Amino acid sequence: MPSLRDLRRRIKSIKSTQQITKAMKAVSAAKMRKAQEAVLSARPYSKRLKSVLGRVAVASGGVSHPLLAVREPKKVAYIVITADRGLCGGFNSNVIRRATQEMREQSAELSLITVGRKSRDFFRRRGYNIAQQYVGLGEEIKYGTAKEIASFVIEKYSAGEYDVVYLVYSQFVNILVQKPVVVKLLPAEPPEEEGEARKVEYIFEPSAAAVLTELLPKYIENAIYQGLLESKAGEHSARMTAMDNATKNASDMIDRLTLSMNRARQAQITKEISEIVGGAAALE
């Protein structure tokens, strides 16, 4: 059985750790609220952009465009978005696991564009071909980052170096749930208009084909930007939940160790009393 000194030392150490997890939970909660507001406010724009792209694609009458070109998937690229840091439960490992599962099913030549240190370090250690990496993006997601990533993959796709490009990230569902998803970025697949929306005729200037040419790169940029926002909100939510669980587990450990310490102290006192009584009896 541990001594009283050891038990006190362990309790003190756990209390110190608990203070850290409490502070990290509070910080993550504040960052999560900000990231959640950003992702929720961006979703309507993303949805409307897809809708507009679908209308323009229909109006353009099947015009050919490099970003719409479908080729045999001999070279496939994956953009994998994770966090730079850990201490967020299974957030990073779930995204990486989903990406590796998808890649195992591919017989094509693979290339990776990693966003976040966790994905970069994981795939680098395992010898994957990392064509581009982005780390240290900070807490505030900038549209320029998404534009830079989009420009890289669009250039590679247009040059025929990639035949298909996928985006893998963790979709923010709610504070407790983050769902890893895989989205095909290229070739771009404009959604089809349904119902009454198909019957509406639009006038495009200078032409639907010209609008489509301008819209497609922005569609790719926005999809990546939305993925970055979703991932950031999910990261902070997962970290807040992980730190909350760690704080609760620390409280449980402190309670158990305190009980053990009280029992040890009681046993020590009982032993001392027995020794005193025994000594007194010996003197009689």
Curated annotation (Swiss-Prot):
- Which PROSITE patterns does this chain map to? ATPASE_GAMMA
Where located? Answer: Cell membrane
The record's principal subcellular location, in a coarse class, is: membrane
User: Does the keyword field hold Ion transport?
Assistant: yes
Fetch the HAMAP family from UniProt. Answer: ATP_synth_gamma_bact
Family listed = Belongs to the ATPase gamma chain family.
Summarize subunit and interaction data from the UniProt record for this chain.
Answer: F-type ATPases have 2 components, CF(1) - the catalytic core - and CF(0) - the membrane proton channel. CF(1) has five subunits: alpha(3), beta(3), gamma(1), delta(1), epsilon(1). CF(0) has three main subunits: a, b and c.
What task does this protein carry out? Produces ATP from ADP in the presence of a proton gradient across the membrane. The gamma chain is believed to be important in regulating ATPase activity and the flow of protons through the CF(0) complex.
Protein name listed in UniProt: ATP synthase gamma chain
Q: From which source organism is this entry?
A: Pelotomaculum thermopropionicum (strain DSM 13744 / JCM 10971 / SI)
Q: Which gene encodes it?
A: atpG
